[in-house]
Amino acid sequence: MNIEEFDYDLPESLIAQTPLKDRDHSRLLVMDRETGEMKHLHFKDIIEYFRPGDTLVLNDTRVMPARLFGLKEETGAKVEMLMLTQIEGNDWEVLLKPAKRIKVGNKLNFGNGKIIAECIKEMDQGGRIMRLHYEGILQERLDELGEMPLPPYIKERLDDPDRYQTVYAKESGSAAAPTAGLHFTDELLTEIKNKGVNIAFVTLHVGLGTFRPVSVDDVNDHEMHSEYYQMTQETADLLNDTKSKGHRIISVGTTSTRTLETIRRDHDKFVETSGWTNIFIYPGFDFKAIDGQITNFHLPKSTLVMLVSAFSTRENVLNAYKTAVNLEYRFFSFGDAMLII
């Protein structure tokens, strides 16, 4: 399966640079998973497609203000550090700009010594493992010194950083937002609950691998980045009960989908668990967890386009994307949404 099969034409003008004033006023393209038939609504109308007994699964990860600007201690040269993943203790996988001159043993100084980062391992593509030294609580230091790490295709400054967080974000650890969840408001979630729909949470901390382009021609040769996930016993019990009663599980975002499918693949049911997943979902994948999913419109030739193609068909998804382009839907993180069901 060639990567070019997941390409599509997207005018740059359709890449949303800012969020809409009201989260749930974004547009919603509803696509039948089997037939590819489409309907065009607004996100707040999504409640029409939920049934009592369904369970909606949200990723409650919180984006860290993980972009730091500092100096190389030895030379005073300016450096930018983007924190990606906590490896263990105070050791983090990071991306550095410029990275070339940062070697093992070099130290970076942020906020006049409030955070010192020491390089302990060099990796490819500008990656490093850095050991952080700081006083107090890391989250407080990041809140003080860091900036929100917006995706590279968003060029405009974000006036309100909370707009790149879901309203239910709780577990800090992501380098990017689970963007399908950005459309929900507290009021809409209350309406959904009042209809008899269950709300469940999982956590998957989104790494920057989400934005890294696939660098191989043959999709089968691609290796996914690993991301940390966890599921509580409460969520596991609710999802198992949903399945046993013949109701539907609808995931919000590809991150929730990857978490749910990882756990069902590894355990044959939902269990309390945590770990790292590099599950790669592309056409031919056998879905065991979800019955529907909400997702944004993704980058051409990305693993996320492959995931949604696997849930329906490549032809259905690319036809929906072509329709969305023609109707001038907004694309990517701050863009509009799809419901595939």
Curated annotation (Swiss-Prot):
One of its GO terms (cellular component) is cytoplasm. Pathway: tRNA modification; tRNA-queuosine biosynthesis. The gene is queA. Keywords: Cytoplasm, Queuosine biosynthesis, S-adenosyl-L-methionine, Transferase. GO terms for molecular function: S-adenosylmethionine:tRNA ribosyltransferase-isomerase activity. It comes from Staphylococcus aureus (strain JH9). Monomer. InterPro entries: QueA, QueA_dom1, QueA_dom2, QueA_sf. It is found in: Cytoplasm. It comes from the Bacteria. Its EC number is 2.4.99.17. This is S-adenosylmethionine:tRNA ribosyltransferase-isomerase. It catalyses: 7-aminomethyl-7-carbaguanosine(34) in tRNA + S-adenosyl-L-methionine = epoxyqueuosine(34) in tRNA + adenine + L-methionine + 2 H(+). Belongs to the QueA family. It is an enzyme of class 2 (transferase). The keyword Transmembrane does not apply. GO terms for biological process: queuosine biosynthetic process; tRNA wobble guanine modification. The keyword Transmembrane does not apply. Transfers and isomerizes the ribose moiety from AdoMet to the 7-aminomethyl group of 7-deazaguanine (preQ1-tRNA) to give epoxyqueuosine (oQ-tRNA). Pfam families: Queuosine_synth.
